[in-house]
Amino acid sequence: MIDKFSTELIKKNFNNAALDYSHYSLIQKYFSNRIVNQLKKLEIPEGDWYDLGSGTGFLADKIEGFSQKKVTRVDFSAKMLFKNKTKSKKLLWDLNNDLPLSNKKTSLIVSNFCLHWLNEPKLKVKNWFDLLIPGGYLIVSVPTNRCFPEWRLTCEKKNIEYSGINFLQTKELADMFLKNEIITLDT
């Protein structure tokens, strides 16, 4: 569980990084492209689209570029969120709180490398899934325990405890859904 102090520190760090974030977020860009390639294959029903943990809006921009559909960007970092100058709707929101989407018109929710920053990520995924209309899609990319092997190796060599986040395993998320409700992509 991420405590309130840590959440505020994470927010501060993202706000401070907003100016240069796009230059250094290579893995996020890679997975944004994978998400967009997957979206192009899907028939998404009419409804509202959301990018949760949107940051500077790189993924939402790419989605709008191919679909002509407006994507609401949601993030808890004001500087990240408002760095993107598009006229798309933006919602400053801490994703640790329930989303204010009670209209049951949501047909697409995407989230790219955000889930690991949240308390109770498995619960959040299930809650997001429950917001979708029938036939809607939730597409989430997450770092896994295979990420950052250099960091783990260095800790092992120095005989110190691994100090990174212990990421969810894809299987942990996949097991929450029926087989016909989920598509997993190999990394």
Question: How does the language model describe each region?
Answer:
Residues M1-L19:
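N-terminal, positively charged/glycine-rich alpha-helical extensions of SAM-dependent methyltransferases
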Residues L26-P45:
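Conserved alpha-helix/loop element of class I SAM-dependent methyltransferases that forms part
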Residues W49-L99:
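Class I SAM-dependent methyltransferase SAM/SAH-binding core
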Residues L99-I109:
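A short acidic, Gly/Pro-enriched loop at the edge of an enzyme's catalytic core
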Residues S107-E120:
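A short SAM/SAH-binding and catalytic strip from SAM-dependent methyltransferases
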Residues K122-Y137:
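A short glycine-rich, Lys/Arg-flanked "PGG" loop and its adjoining helix->strand segment in the class I
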Residues Y137-T187:
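Conserved catalytic/acceptor-binding region of the Class I
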